[in-house]
């Protein structure tokens, strides 16, 4: 349901939209040059090769700057723009991978420093600790991160995602943390690594049964089921580590009703308390009030 926060969604493959490799791109440019070998095209082919040389040296940052300079040149012929744009995409991809590899190789304490810089805007960098073994992530480092889980000003989804990341770090498994749920206005003591999603036993059973009922209700509507699952995710986050104080069958039926109305572009009845709860729970994850579409 809730996707594990264990990937950096950089969409790296999407950056390689036009050409799969530098070689393929260079061959395409060379083929164009054979049929359009004017002086300006020859000049830019040389500039292209200079960037390629930087790529061979793995100096992707400089290569990125050079690509951007060539694209900004007022005399760059329009037919050549796509070659440099595609080259920039490939360079951006490799620069991002290079930066990620450099960050992942940092000591755990340094990664935690980066996580806490410009708080809370870099919390997602906690994921660089996930591949590290217990030998590299000592339990005492957790003390520096505990406050994030009890920060009442932090958006619930961010706090939940941060907890889920901590829950997967081998060096922190077995350690106890305090977790504050701002919706419930309660603190909970949770053990890291004990469960994939550290819910109370009755909450785990509640959501498993809710998922099953939703699957049955949307058996012939798989696309609508995806939206219904997003609603379940929102409830899981908002009430974590508990479950909503609503009879399971009633909530499943109302989720089905709400999704069906939205898909058909029908007005929803906000006077219905359960429908209202669904809407508010969804908006809680967006950190804006119901009706604020800006």
UniProtKB/Swiss-Prot annotation:
Pfam families: DUF3196. It comes from Mycoplasma pneumoniae (strain ATCC 29342 / M129 / Subtype 1). This is Uncharacterized protein MG237 homolog. InterPro entries: DUF3196 (IPR024503), Uncharacterised_MG237_central (IPR023402), Uncharacterised_MG237_N (IPR023403).
